[in-house]
Amino acid sequence: MISKTLQLSNNRTAHYFEQGEGEPLVLIHGVGMQAEAWYPQIEYFSKHYHVISLDMPGHGQSTALAADAQLQDFVDWAIECIHTLNLGPVNLAGHSMGSLITTGVSVTRPDLVKRMAVLNGVYKRTHAAREAVIQRAEALKQGHLDIETPLQRWFGQSEIEKIASERVKLWLENVNMSGYTTAYRAFAQGDLVYADGWSDIECPALVLTGTDDPNSTAEMTIQMAHQAKHGTAIVIENERHMVNLTAPEKVNQAMQAWLETTP
């Protein structure tokens, strides 16, 4: 992977990893992660695609947004990144918070998106689920960083899960606390922002989760795919929130089929 930096407006920079040649595939990770969190997909797809994995604002080496930034600000950031890359319409995939950003870009700037993929996204949370995630965002604001609870929620005890868990733990331990807090608040408040725009998405849309992800549920996944004009829902058995790391072969297979669909 080649480490690169985009120069954005207002003296901000966006860091990304780049590998491979071909159609552009842009990847956006979730809250608390970094560009490397797509490592199985970068390795696999860079054989035939031009893969660009971005550090979200305030994560990795990318400049943070303002502390009060909302989901729309992260979407504007992604739009500016795609413009600055100057690759034309891209295949855009997001995980978790990255999925909300991907949805926002696809709804507001369809001219920039050839295909879109949402992995472990959220859609119209229940009241209880929304309250729980807002409470977690508030705890972060107060400086309480709980690493073990999400790790227990995201990973089981298989060998591949233990390996992925160690990498994710390291990223969380080294997270920029203010950038993490800003992104988590936007994530907590963002599930409704573009939810009603799914019916406007006309490009091929892959929506994927695991059966055992309690917050990005199979029901949400099916609803999103059903709303899109050309949506496909895939729910992988016995997988949780970090499915791209714990079931990379199945995720790569689903994404490969998505990339081969005709826009």
UniProtKB/Swiss-Prot annotation:
Catalytic reactions of this protein: (E)-2-((N-methylformamido) methylene)succinate + 2 H2O + H(+) = succinate semialdehyde + methylamine + formate + CO2
EC number(s) given by UniProt: 3.5.1.-
Alphabetic keyword roster: Hydrolase
GO molecular function, one term: hydrolase activity, acting on carbon-nitrogen (but not peptide) bonds
Superkingdom field: Bacteria
UniProt xrefs under Gene3D superfamilies: alpha/beta hydrolase (3.40.50.1820)
Enzyme class name: hydrolase
Active-site residues, Swiss-Prot/TrEMBL: S96 (nucleophile), N120, H241
PANTHER family recorded: MONOACYLGLYCEROL LIPASE
Family, similarity comment: Belongs to the AB hydrolase superfamily.
Cited function: Involved in the degradation of the pyridine ring of trigonelline (TG; N-methylnicotinate) into succinate and methylamine as carbon and nitrogen sources, respectively. Catalyzes the hydrolysis of (E)-2-((N-methylformamido)methylene)succinate (MFMS) into formic acid, succinate semialdehyde (SSA), methylamine and carbon dioxide.
Assembly and oligomerization: Monomer.
Listed name of the protein: (E)-2-((N-methylformamido)methylene)succinate hydrolase
Organism: Acinetobacter baylyi (strain ATCC 33305 / BD413 / ADP1)
Native organism taxonomy: Bacteria, Pseudomonadati, Pseudomonadota, Gammaproteobacteria, Moraxellales
Gene: tgnD
